[in-house]
């Protein structure tokens, strides 16, 4: 293997801003920002969604309307589309 071609693997703090949670995870992501947690300075990255805020993981799934996209389209624009085949 060639020396000095691999990215630096280190502990990085990811901040889920939607729920104000911090995660210390090993990563190779590059960032110029830093944060101090527990007396140690870590690289810092903000994220919008994580396992603490995503509806799939939190169990707070949105209820999906019973009609799909095609039904909504037909309801809105059905009067403009001919129902006869081949015309």
UniProtKB/Swiss-Prot annotation:
Keywords: Ribonucleoprotein, Ribosomal protein. One of its GO terms (biological process) is translation. It comes from the Bacteria. This is Large ribosomal subunit protein bL31B. The keyword Thylakoid does not apply. Pfam families: Ribosomal_L31. PANTHER family: 50S RIBOSOMAL PROTEIN L31, CHLOROPLASTIC, LARGE RIBOSOMAL SUBUNIT PROTEIN BL31C. GO terms for molecular function: structural constituent of ribosome. Belongs to the bacterial ribosomal protein bL31 family. Type B subfamily. HAMAP family: Ribosomal_bL31_2. GO terms for cellular component: ribonucleoprotein complex; ribosome. Part of the 50S ribosomal subunit.
